[in-house]
Amino acid sequence: MAWWRQGYIKKIFDEVGNKIGGISFAILGIAAYDFKKLGFNETYMHTTPSQALEMGKSLKANKVIGSHFLTFVLSLEKVLDPPKLFKENAEKYGYKKDDAVIFKIGEVKNLKELTN
């Protein structure tokens, strides 16, 4: 698959992380990734929860915020899996569970809450 049709290109995210030297938080998509039964072997322009956590590490983000889930059913993963997997896998990628943030529907937080 062409590089531009993938959600995560490690080389690019590593380069950005190295160039800027880290960020407070990254907002990254965590859903609409399971297209295997449709004939695609890769995530096709979206990222898995694990890829989002890896992207956060590449960007040297202190916290990662999972986004782009529970909106539309665009692929074949179970609708509630992405936020669950995102939190469950946080520690594998060097994040504390509290540093992998999932907002509830309608939840609002200010930047001070996110950066503490």
Where are these regions (language model features)?
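Cap/insert and terminal regions of metallo-dependent hydrolase folds
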Residues: Y8-F103
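C-terminal regions of proteins
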Residues: D98-N116
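Conserved beta-strand hairpin/beta-sheet module of binuclear metal-dependent hydrolase folds
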Residues: M1-Q6
